[in-house]
Amino acid sequence: TFAFADAASITHEQRETGTGTGIRSIFTGFGHSAYSFETYVWVERASGDVLFEWIPLNEQGLNITNVTWPAAMDFDCADDHDTTLITHEQGVMIPNTWPTAVSTKDIAFDGRFETAGGYMPWFAQLRADGHGYIAICETPWNAGYGIDHPSNGPYTHINTWFEPSLGTMNYRRVVRYQFLDHADHTAVCKAYRLYVNERGRLRTLAEKAARNPSVRDLIGRSWVHIGIKTKVQPDSYYYDKDHPEKNESLVTFAQREKQMRTLHSMGAGRLYMHLDGWAQPGYDNAHPDYLPACQ
């Protein structure tokens, strides 16, 4: 493990371009190797956003497994209304004084973006006075977030991490910080929505329904996420050698149908069943050749 300050040589220069101004820093020499990278921290003129870029230059001599940068913000006030937002599953808001400890290991897939640990590639922190920021990872493919919140706080620290792609860091990594005033969790979500819309990546429910009218049937339904068959392979990371009976499970389609009817009769209303592991190979095997259905 090395800190950026451990580099044998560190240089800085100011850079001025048509889009913004910032500081370019080059870090060379770690652990008697020639490994080097640069960072570019700059303010975008058009938006006022601050962009943090990490760029590999010479990857010889070190086998990098993780880069943790930018570091966590100072967010250490013991205030119930100082909150951290993460896109873990359906979304989580963590007050600084929350009694339950939260760490990266508690998050699905260690907070990896574009997974259940971070369905959208952003996190945010809001002060009680409405000041805050949203951090948007513009290169989320080999990235995620780390989080540290002790029981009862008084702080929550959150930062971005990057990992190699096919053995090397290989390409530029970028995180955009947008600073907000008079913000709440709704304002943060609207900021991200505006960000993706400006880049042509927003697809509204109305647009999706125009392509697939059955989308309209989902509105107002409760989402029930369940499975039929699971079969964890012996060479899988998730295989439990100590408890092999946990590597396989099976619930019949008839049992799932009865479960849905029972929930509905108890007043659950309109339901949408998300069914995993419905094919003979079991969850999560043989994609994309998943047929036939489980018998």
Regions found by a protein language model. Give the residues of each.
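Carbohydrate-recognition beta-sandwich/jelly-roll modules
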Residues: 1-285, 290
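Acidic, His- and aromatic-enriched active-site or binding-groove loops in soluble protein domains
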Residues: 293-295
